[in-house]
């Protein structure tokens, strides 16, 4: 997952010198390789908490069955409703902060009332990751954006990696924040995108407060089912006696 910065700089300097000397190697175009995380998340995704994902009625029985393992059949329906409600928010940013409060990342208290909006924004219905390229399409399949992205930073607290578009666009698809989750490990991915890299770092403050996308691979029922089971376990295992 890591790229040696100093080695890259030295290599670029050497290539530049060889190009000035007329070396054939200097004329060759250098191709950036995707990071390990970019490779691991390759695929086409839909929002996990959407009718294309875990909110579809076909998953209702699984939600109830999994919840019943931890809280019993009598309380399963209520538990599922609460879990879904936490991730089906309808507002983000300043509106969400007014509603739920502003909290720094080092505040780990989530006991109060809150909702996260976990869906795509800005007209995106599906995201496709292929190598260094990220493409978003709307519900009709029309392209919303498509750019290649390069790693520009990391956040140790969340294990996040930040990527910036190579195309110079200044819009809500300039930066992507990818968390460590991958289909191979947790059956889903978690991410954000936007125009301000610093704002993307704040979970419950600023422009992107209370917005964190959860996504599963489109048409992959095995992933969706496994992600539901994992989500229920993480939220209800403390309730099991």
Residue locations for each model-derived region?
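Calycin-type beta-barrel ligand-binding domains and close structural analogs
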Residues: 26, 51, 100-241
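Internal, charge-rich low-complexity segments
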Residues: 50-87
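Extended, polar beta-sheet/loop recognition surfaces of beta-rich domains
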Residues: 86-91, 97
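Positively charged n-region of N-terminal signal peptides that target proteins for export
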Residues: 1-5
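Boundary at the C-terminal end of the N-terminal hydrophobic targeting segment
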Residues: 19-22, 26-28
């Amino acid at each position: 997952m890591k790229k040696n910065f100093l080695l890259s700089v030295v290599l670029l300097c050497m290539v530049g010198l060889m190009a000035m000397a007329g070396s054939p190697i200097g004329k060759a175009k250098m191709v950036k390789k995707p990071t390990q995380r970019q490779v691991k998340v390759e695929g086409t995704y839909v929002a996990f908490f959407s009718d294309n994902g875990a909110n579809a009625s076909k998953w209702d029985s699984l939600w109830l069955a999994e919840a019943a393992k931890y809280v019993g059949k009598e309380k399963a329906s209520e538990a599922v409703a609460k879990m879904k409600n936490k991730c089906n928010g309808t507002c983000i940013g300043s509106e969400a902060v007014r509603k739920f409060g502003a909290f720094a990342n080092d505040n780990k208290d989530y006991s109060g009332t809150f909702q996260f909006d976990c869906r795509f924004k800005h007209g995106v219905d599906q995201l496709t990751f292929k190598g260094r390229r990220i493409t978003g399409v709307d519900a009709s399949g029309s392209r919303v954006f498509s750019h290649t992205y390069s790693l520009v930073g990391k956040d140790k607290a969340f294990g996040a990696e930040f990527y910036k578009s190579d195309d110079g666009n200044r819009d809500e698809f300039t930066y992507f924040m990818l968390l460590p989750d991958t289909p191979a490990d947790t059956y889903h991915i978690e991410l954000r995108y936007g125009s301000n890299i610093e704002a993307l770092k704040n979970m419950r403050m600023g422009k992107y407060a209370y917005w964190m996308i959860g996504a599963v691979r489109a048409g992959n029922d095995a992933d969706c089912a496994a992600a539901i089971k994992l989500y229920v376990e993480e939220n209800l295992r403390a309730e099991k006696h």
